[in-house]
Amino acid sequence: MRASYLFTSESVSEGHPDKVCDRISDEIVDLFYREGPKAGIDPWQIRAACETLATTNKVVIAGETRGPKSVTNEQIEGVVRAAIKDIGYEQEGFHWKTCDIEILLHPQSADIAQGVDALQPGEVKEEGAGDQGIMFGYATNETPDLMPAPIFYAHKILRLISEARHSGREKVLGPDSKSQVTVQYENGKPVGVREIVVSHQHLVPDLTSSQVRDIVEPYVREALPKDWITPKTIWHINPTGKFYIGGPDGDAGLTGRKIIVDTYGGAAPHGGGAFSGKDPTKVDRSAAYAARYVAKNIVAAGLADRCTLQLAYAIGVARPLSIYIDTHGTGKVPEEQLEKAAAQAMDLTPRGIRSHLDLNRPIYARTSAYGHFGRTPDNEGGFSWEKTDLVEQLKRAL
């Protein structure tokens, strides 16, 4: 391991155009999970794959669903407008009341459904994966939430500013923003911040970069460890000088374009599949959650300081094709033993993951901004993959 290096990660706010689309897609997934039980539909039978495009005063929603027929386009439109309103868009080029919404949802392909729903030989009551693919999970003990420091603090900066904006304390700030944090590492441990970037939309046209810095700097300092900012830290606040036109009016958004922001900020591999808009039969989402869950519990158990875990699946096949663990030289037991322990401690079939993490619930809109990982599990079942309740099972399996 290098003695000294810099590593950078970025985050974006819930008002970033791509995150607006992630939020809308996940709100629709949640809608189907809320309405399904009301119509007598087993949550295990709900399916949703929803993609969103947002641009100037226009939202287009396309994809495949299976669920209650009681979910109408009017109901979906209402959910979309409520999401945009909650994010805070009331500007001329993108307003929750007046933007045009086009809905192009249709039933899930029968060819895909037969692979997911069909019983597999020798695997009674098991459902196959919704697609092939590889998924990664990662954990490190360099922050309390067992996340890499650069992405952890990049998220925290924007989350604090967003809370201030929503509370009404910072009325001149708009919904769209980005952050980037360059962290200095010594002997593999984060010790300070070399560079800070914050680009934040403002609602007053002639607000200067200096004035925006006066607004956001206290939140940046609150987010970071006290001694990490020094006189040598370089600040870049609205470096282009002006950020008045923001959101989908300034830059078109799409679901699934912020997969590194959603995960580990580039500190770990990514299998390439996005999360938002997908029900948990899609292993792009559910298996990535499971991989994080197992990796986090390995680190929480003290079995490694860092852990990368890869899972692989084939469409229509229930069992994972492979489980791979790399502890980056920090493991307390051989990685081959950890791989066996992971398989014993948790059922990593799609059904096993959905059951263990209780994923057949309307818990997805809350994941659509500020990362799917490093979050606090809530009372409604959200972020269940962040629990550390697998520690004892892993230890017993070794």
From Swiss-Prot:
Pfam families: S-AdoMet_synt_C (PF02773), S-AdoMet_synt_M (PF02772), S-AdoMet_synt_N (PF00438). It comes from Bradyrhizobium diazoefficiens (strain JCM 10833 / BCRC 13528 / IAM 13628 / NBRC 14792 / USDA 110). GO terms for molecular function: ATP binding; magnesium ion binding; methionine adenosyltransferase activity. It is an enzyme of class 2 (transferase). This is S-adenosylmethionine synthase. InterPro entries: ADOMET_SYNTHASE_CS, S-AdoMet_synt_C, S-AdoMet_synt_central, S-AdoMet_synt_N, S-AdoMet_synthetase, S-AdoMet_synthetase_sfam. GO terms for biological process: one-carbon metabolic process; S-adenosylmethionine biosynthetic process. Its EC number is 2.5.1.6. It catalyses: L-methionine + ATP + H2O = S-adenosyl-L-methionine + phosphate + diphosphate. It is found in: Cytoplasm. The lineage of its organism: Bacteria, Pseudomonadati, Pseudomonadota, Alphaproteobacteria, Hyphomicrobiales. The gene is metK. Binds 2 divalent ions per subunit. Binds 1 potassium ion per subunit. Catalyzes the formation of S-adenosylmethionine (AdoMet) from methionine and ATP. The overall synthetic reaction is composed of two sequential steps, AdoMet formation and the subsequent tripolyphosphate hydrolysis which occurs prior to release of AdoMet from the enzyme. Keywords: ATP-binding, Cytoplasm, Magnesium, Metal-binding, Nucleotide-binding, One-carbon metabolism, Potassium, Transferase.
